[in-house]
């Protein structure tokens, strides 16, 4: 769950457990997630506060119990670490989205390249845009930021201005998808 500011606990106590890092996890039992009503209640509460929910689905895209999270107009943000091995898996991840949700699912996908090494392999984003043009909604990049690799909760203000701006672009792209704006790569 990502929030731009504090969100009162009273809204979430009935729906979430709290991880040791302070993040909130929407209730889940076995292969059942929260009910559709719970998703709508939480989403409405977040929107009223000007913040958004982020659901990390990992590799479980095809799990039936996650279908409510993938329903239109929900944006799909596919994060790809800027490493050759991760880019080798990009094609299969996009194919999985296409196989599961069809072309409309791909059209709601924002591919986000996360640079995790200041001196490591760099992707040619223009070439990636050329390759994926017309298939996905957009492509964004997150620059390397030493704070992101620390493995702890990070204050927004501690991130480099370029990193904050990049996350704001990803957020704006996700909002545009959710609002049905048709811009694509």
Descriptions of predicted regions:
Residues 21, 72-75, 103-109, 135-137:
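Short glycine-/polar-rich loops that comprise or flank the Walker A/P-loop
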Residues 1-24:
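Phosphate-binding loop that captures ATP/GTP phosphates
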Residues 2-6, 96-101, 108-109, 129, ...:
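Acidic-aromatic/histidine active-site loop/patch
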Residues 115-160:
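Beta-strand-loop-alpha "switch" segments that mediate conformational coupling across diverse proteins
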Residues 151-185:
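NTP-binding/hydrolysis catalytic cores, primarily Walker-type P-loop NTPases
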Residues 26-29, 54-56, 77-82, 109-116:
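Conserved beta-strand segments of the P-loop GTPase G domain that flank and frequently precede/overlap
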Residues 74-92, 117-120:
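Conserved Switch II/interswitch segment of TRAFAC-class P-loop GTPases
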Residues 18-69:
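Phosphate-binding/switch loop-helix module in NTP-utilizing enzymes
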């Amino acid at each position: 769950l990502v929030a731009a500011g504090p969100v009162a606990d009273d809204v979430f106590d009935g729906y979430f457990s709290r991880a040791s890092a302070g993040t909130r996890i929407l209730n889940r039992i076995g292969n059942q997630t929260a009910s559709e009503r719970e998703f709508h209640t939480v989403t409405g509460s977040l929107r009223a506060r000007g913040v958004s929910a982020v659901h990390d689905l990992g590799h479980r895209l095809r799990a039936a119990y996650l279908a409510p999270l993938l329903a239109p107009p929900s944006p799909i943000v596919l994060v790809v670490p800027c490493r050759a091995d991760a880019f080798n898996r990009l094609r299969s991840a996009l194919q999985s989205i296409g196989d599961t949700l069809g072309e409309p699912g791909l059209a709601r996908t924002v591919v986000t390249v996360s640079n995790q090494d200041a001196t490591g392999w760099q992707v040619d984003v223009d070439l990636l845009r050329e390759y994926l043009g017309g298939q996905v909604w957009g492509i964004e990049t997150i620059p390397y930021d030493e704070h992101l690799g620390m493995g702890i909760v990070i204050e927004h203000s501690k991130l480099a201005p370029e990193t904050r701006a990049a996350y704001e672009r990803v957020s704006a792209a996700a909002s545009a998808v959710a609002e049905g704006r048709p811009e694509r790569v």
